[in-house]
Protein backbone atom coordinates (compact mmCIF):
# COMPACT_ATOMS: atom_id res chain seq x y z
CA UNK A 1 0.00 0.00 0.00
CA UNK A 2 1.38 3.40 -0.94
CA UNK A 3 2.19 6.14 1.56
CA UNK A 4 -0.43 8.36 -0.07
CA UNK A 5 -3.16 5.77 0.41
CA UNK A 6 -2.18 5.17 4.06
CA UNK A 7 -2.10 8.92 4.73
CA UNK A 8 -5.54 9.27 3.12
CA UNK A 9 -6.98 6.46 5.25
CA UNK A 10 -5.51 7.97 8.42
CA UNK A 11 -7.01 11.35 7.48
CA UNK A 12 -10.45 9.82 6.88
CA UNK A 13 -10.30 7.90 10.16
CA UNK A 14 -9.36 11.08 12.03
CA UNK A 15 -12.26 12.97 10.47
CA UNK A 16 -14.71 10.21 11.31
CA UNK A 17 -13.62 10.11 14.94
CA UNK A 18 -13.68 13.89 15.47
CA UNK A 19 -15.75 15.62 18.14
CA UNK A 20 -19.42 14.89 18.02
CA UNK A 21 -22.16 17.15 19.27
CA UNK A 22 -24.76 15.63 21.55
CA UNK A 23 -28.11 17.30 21.09
CA UNK A 24 -30.50 17.45 24.01
CA UNK A 25 -34.14 17.26 23.01
CA UNK A 26 -35.15 17.99 26.61
CA UNK A 27 -35.38 14.37 27.69
CA UNK A 28 -31.75 14.20 28.88
CA UNK A 29 -31.42 15.93 32.22
CA UNK A 30 -28.52 16.59 34.52
CA UNK A 31 -24.93 16.76 33.34
CA UNK A 32 -22.02 14.36 32.93
CA UNK A 33 -19.95 16.08 35.65
CA UNK A 34 -20.57 18.33 38.66
CA UNK A 35 -18.74 21.25 37.03
CA UNK A 36 -20.71 20.86 33.82
CA UNK A 37 -23.98 20.92 35.80
CA UNK A 38 -22.94 24.26 37.33
CA UNK A 39 -21.77 25.62 33.97
CA UNK A 40 -25.07 24.64 32.32
CA UNK A 41 -27.06 26.16 35.20
CA UNK A 42 -25.18 29.46 35.01
CA UNK A 43 -25.47 29.62 31.23
CA UNK A 44 -29.23 29.09 31.50
CA UNK A 45 -29.41 31.80 34.20
CA UNK A 46 -27.82 34.36 31.89
CA UNK A 47 -30.04 33.30 29.00
CA UNK A 48 -33.07 33.65 31.30
CA UNK A 49 -34.00 30.11 30.24
CA UNK A 50 -36.03 28.68 33.11
CA UNK A 51 -36.60 25.41 31.25
CA UNK A 52 -32.86 24.86 30.77
CA UNK A 53 -32.21 25.73 34.43
CA UNK A 54 -34.78 23.07 35.33
CA UNK A 55 -32.90 20.35 33.46
CA UNK A 56 -29.88 20.58 35.80
CA UNK A 57 -31.56 21.70 39.04
CA UNK A 58 -32.52 18.67 41.09
CA UNK A 59 -31.67 16.07 43.70
CA UNK A 60 -30.41 12.50 43.93
CA UNK A 61 -33.86 11.54 42.62
CA UNK A 62 -33.40 13.49 39.37
CA UNK A 63 -34.55 16.85 38.05
CA UNK A 64 -36.72 18.96 40.35
CA UNK A 65 -39.19 19.39 37.50
CA UNK A 66 -40.23 15.78 38.08
CA UNK A 67 -40.88 16.17 41.81
CA UNK A 68 -41.77 19.83 42.45
CA UNK A 69 -44.96 21.58 41.38
CA UNK A 70 -44.29 23.44 38.12
CA UNK A 71 -45.46 26.84 39.39
CA UNK A 72 -43.44 26.50 42.59
CA UNK A 73 -40.33 25.40 40.68
CA UNK A 74 -40.61 28.31 38.23
CA UNK A 75 -40.87 30.78 41.15
CA UNK A 76 -37.74 29.31 42.74
CA UNK A 77 -35.79 29.37 39.49
CA UNK A 78 -36.80 32.98 38.72
CA UNK A 79 -35.51 34.04 42.14
CA UNK A 80 -32.28 32.08 41.65
CA UNK A 81 -31.86 33.66 38.20
CA UNK A 82 -31.99 37.12 39.79
CA UNK A 83 -29.29 36.30 42.32
CA UNK A 84 -26.98 34.36 40.01
CA UNK A 85 -27.21 36.57 36.90
CA UNK A 86 -23.62 37.56 36.16
CA UNK A 87 -21.24 39.11 33.64
CA UNK A 88 -18.58 36.41 33.98
CA UNK A 89 -18.00 33.17 35.84
CA UNK A 90 -14.80 31.30 36.67
CA UNK A 91 -14.62 27.88 38.30
CA UNK A 92 -12.20 27.96 41.23
CA UNK A 93 -12.28 24.30 42.19
CA UNK A 94 -14.26 21.24 43.06
CA UNK A 95 -14.20 19.21 46.28
CA UNK A 96 -15.97 16.28 47.83
CA UNK A 97 -18.77 17.54 50.02
CA UNK A 98 -20.97 15.89 52.61
CA UNK A 99 -23.66 13.30 51.92
CA UNK A 100 -22.43 12.36 48.41
CA UNK A 101 -22.30 15.98 47.25
CA UNK A 102 -19.57 17.60 45.18
CA UNK A 103 -18.94 21.27 45.94
CA UNK A 104 -18.06 23.49 42.99
CA UNK A 105 -16.61 26.87 43.93
CA UNK A 106 -17.19 29.66 41.42
CA UNK A 107 -16.22 33.31 41.18
CA UNK A 108 -19.02 35.41 39.71
CA UNK A 109 -18.60 38.99 38.54
CA UNK A 110 -21.39 41.45 37.93
CA UNK A 111 -20.54 45.04 37.18
CA UNK A 112 -17.96 46.13 39.73
CA UNK A 113 -18.84 43.32 42.16
CA UNK A 114 -16.95 40.05 42.45
CA UNK A 115 -18.16 37.24 44.70
CA UNK A 116 -17.15 33.66 45.40
CA UNK A 117 -19.95 31.18 45.92
CA UNK A 118 -20.38 27.43 46.19
CA UNK A 119 -22.73 25.21 44.23
CA UNK A 120 -23.64 21.86 45.75
CA UNK A 121 -24.14 19.10 43.21
CA UNK A 122 -25.29 15.53 43.61
CA UNK A 123 -25.37 12.50 41.36
CA UNK A 124 -28.83 11.33 40.38
CA UNK A 125 -30.26 8.63 38.15
CA UNK A 126 -28.21 7.43 35.16
CA UNK A 127 -25.06 8.89 36.81
CA UNK A 128 -26.16 12.44 35.89
CA UNK A 129 -25.22 15.38 38.10
CA UNK A 130 -27.65 18.03 39.38
CA UNK A 131 -27.24 21.38 41.14
CA UNK A 132 -29.31 20.90 44.27
CA UNK A 133 -28.24 23.87 46.37
CA UNK A 134 -26.03 26.93 46.30
CA UNK A 135 -24.68 29.63 48.60
CA UNK A 136 -27.11 32.42 47.74
CA UNK A 137 -25.92 34.64 50.62
CA UNK A 138 -22.60 35.19 48.84
CA UNK A 139 -24.35 36.86 45.89
CA UNK A 140 -27.27 38.52 47.70
CA UNK A 141 -26.17 41.95 46.48
CA UNK A 142 -26.33 40.85 42.80
CA UNK A 143 -30.13 40.90 42.76
CA UNK A 144 -31.78 44.29 42.31
CA UNK A 145 -28.74 46.26 43.37
CA UNK A 146 -28.24 49.37 41.26
CA UNK A 147 -24.66 49.61 42.57
CA UNK A 148 -23.36 46.80 40.39
CA UNK A 149 -22.13 49.28 37.83
CA UNK A 150 -24.53 48.08 35.15
CA UNK A 151 -26.47 50.96 33.74
CA UNK A 152 -28.84 50.95 30.83
CA UNK A 153 -29.10 47.18 30.66
Feature-to-residue mapping (PLM):
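Short, charge-rich, low-complexity alpha-helical interaction segments
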Residues: 17-21
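Bacterial N-terminal signal peptides that target proteins for export
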Residues: 1-7
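Exposed beta-sheet edge and beta->alpha loop/turn motif
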Residues: 81-83, 89-153
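C-terminal motif of bacterial Sec signal peptides marking the signal peptidase cleavage site
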Residues: 13-14
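Short solvent-exposed beta->alpha transition segments
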Residues: 27-29, 35-40, 47-101, 109-112
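Alpha-helical interaction segments
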Residues: 5, 30-32, 43, 73, ...
Amino acid sequence: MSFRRVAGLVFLAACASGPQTVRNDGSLTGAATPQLAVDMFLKAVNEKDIQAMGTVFGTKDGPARQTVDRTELEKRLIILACYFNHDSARTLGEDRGTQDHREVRVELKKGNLSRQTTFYTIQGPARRWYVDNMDIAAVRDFCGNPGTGRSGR
